[in-house]
């Protein structure tokens, strides 16, 4: 994918609408009713090291002539979700799907304990129109302890174990029977709004505060950073703490804080220019090869 992006950057005439660089990952199945998102759910561009992260920071500096405040958040390794509330009540939940259309998983999301079925009264004043729908977004994940327990039970019953908590969360979310989802011990972190004009907040930091007030599960490991050094420190600390967290993370998301500045930077075909995902170095582990079986193939 990275080589394809570099090729298209050097030769724009080769870019086609069917290119993977122009699409958001995911799919829409036939098991659940399709739901069209209020606004497109974008992917994020990746920075594979601090040098690439600095290149993005330089683009931000070039856009505004100075370093502007950014919000650093842990990148949860789960499944994206969009929750729609009308008159303060949860009326719909949808997967990201292809970014434009997702799947209706409302019945299943209602079983996730930390998803408020109704917004707290104190937060309704933060809605510009309390009766109008507002779409809030985040990540559904499975805690490490729940994942381990699920796989122990699966193996005990002769069923195939899940490869990782992310797959387990996605599979649990798309169950036909909500009772199965309810028993999978899913959790969420909510961190975004589809249309910031729906709320009386001016930036990401203020949005996170409103989400907490409204009753959502918001990750406490966030930081408002005003310098490149502060961003680096957050990323390095996240790498150090990765194994100790009760849930899986695979990076840090850095976002320009002010919504007005986000709007000024805009989007590419697949990702916002005002955000970047700093990806952790791949984990290295040792595998012990206990035995091999040598066989002769049918062609000798």
Predicted regions and their residues:
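RNA/tRNA-interacting regions in translation and RNA-turnover enzymes
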Residues: 1-299
């Amino acid at each position: 994918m990275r080589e394809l992006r570099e090729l298209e950057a050097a030769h724009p005439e080769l870019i086609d609408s069917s290119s993977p660089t122009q699409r958001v990952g995911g799919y829409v199945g036939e098991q659940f009713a399709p739901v069209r998102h209020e606004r497109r759910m974008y992917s994020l561009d990746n920075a594979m090291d601090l040098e690439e992260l600095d290149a993005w920071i330089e683009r931000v500096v070039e856009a505004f002539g100075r370093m502007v405040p950014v919000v650093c958040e842990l990148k949860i390794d789960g499944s994206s979700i969009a929750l729609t509330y009308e008159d303060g009540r949860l009326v719909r939940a949808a997967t990201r799907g292809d970014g434009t259309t997702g799947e209706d998983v409302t019945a299943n999301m209602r079983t996730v304990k930390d998803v408020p079925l109704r917004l707290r009264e104190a937060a309704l004043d933060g809605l510009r129109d309390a009766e109008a729908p507002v779409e809030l977004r985040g990540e559904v994940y499975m805690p490490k302890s729940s994942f381990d327990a699920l796989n122990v039970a699966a193996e005990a019953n002769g069923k195939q174990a899940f490869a990782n908590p992310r797959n387990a969360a996605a599979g649990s979310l798309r169950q036909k029977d909500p009772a199965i989802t309810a028993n999978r011990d899913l959790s969420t972190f909510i961190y975004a709004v589809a249309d910031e004009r729906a709320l009386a907040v001016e930036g990401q930091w203020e949005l996170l505060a409103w989400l907490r007030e409204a009753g959502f599960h918001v990750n406490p490991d966030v930081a408002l950073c005003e310098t490149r050094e502060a961003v680096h420190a957050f990323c390095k600390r996240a790498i150090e703490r990765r194994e100790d967290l009760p849930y899986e993370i695979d990076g840090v998301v850095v976002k320009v804080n002010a919504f007005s500045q986000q709007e000024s930077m805009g989007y590419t075909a697949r990702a916002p220019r005002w955000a970047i995902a700093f990806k952790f170095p791949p984990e290295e582990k040792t595998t012990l090869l206990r035995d091999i079986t040598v066989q002769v193939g049918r062609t000798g």
